[in-house]
């Protein structure tokens, strides 16, 4: 059984695109960031969906490129006292939850996520309170406040296994916030899942008819899909998985042409993993609609070179992540529960959006 809690779909205002830098400006800010990282005893951790030049700089300076949970775990193991998180705000919060002793900075605290915005804590708390018999499972793409209300936090790479486990115990589930991932998990597990009606503004735009036309142009191509995409798109996939799972699939699939339905920021690491393969973005327009995100998160795009330099240089309330200690402790409980479960399964937890 799968039900949908239907809230009004929101159209979120996108941030202004960063002013493009010329070649000299890019070189200036790259060198400035390298200097500031050393001066601030900081390490740059970047999400797969940031722009390629940011991912390259993270690797060049000894940082990492990963999903949000792995970014936080990398920061925990790194000796630097400061983490500069290039991503969206919930990723900075997750890093702070897992690394309370470290300073966590972001290029901007205004880099949002539609899944986070679409799950306000007051409304979600009321929803959970109206279904007290259900176990609350929230995706990593949520605020610290929402995580603190959950029994479990989960990433896309372990979602099916966790829901199957809870279903085997006879538990009924509240799933939040992504309706497409919730539907995918319910279909795979057969569990009783009540879904919050959120969606990723990037993955929600992938279209089946346009994808079918593209597949007709490249009949030998494999289709790789993130499960935050609509179910009809997922059904067309040769491989479905989290960010890290899609990169692994790109390496192992025999096809030399890949159509990829996720944020195009992933192409930087995916092309590294399989330099001999040709990658295409899955279409996000068609069927009477134009794209808004066009396969790239507008909030991820806020993590530019100038913004990173300003975050390191200025710090302060405009860039520093703060999570109340009581809230942090509450959010840490479901996060640790997931990590312990994963260790029991001997699975490596990676792969929220």
UniProtKB/Swiss-Prot annotation:
Named in its record, the pathway it takes part in is: Cofactor biosynthesis; NAD(+) biosynthesis; quinolinate from iminoaspartate: step 1/1
Entry keywords, A to Z: 4Fe-4S, Cytoplasm, Iron, Iron-sulfur, Metal-binding, Pyridine nucleotide biosynthesis, Transferase
Q: Which reaction does it catalyse?
A: iminosuccinate + dihydroxyacetone phosphate = quinolinate + phosphate + 2 H2O + H(+)
Q: What is its main location?
A: cytoplasm
Required co-factor(s) are:
[4Fe-4S] cluster
* Residues given in the record as iminosuccinate binding sites: 47, 68, 139-141, 156, 226-228, 243
Q: Which residues are listed for [4Fe-4S] cluster binding in this entry?
A: 113, 200, 297
Kindly name one Pfam family recorded for this protein: NadA
Q: Which family does it belong to?
A: Belongs to the quinolinate synthase family. Type 1 subfamily.
Q: What is this protein called?
A: Quinolinate synthase
Name the lineage: Bacteria, Pseudomonadati, Pseudomonadota, Gammaproteobacteria, Enterobacterales
The UniProt gene name for this protein comes to nadA
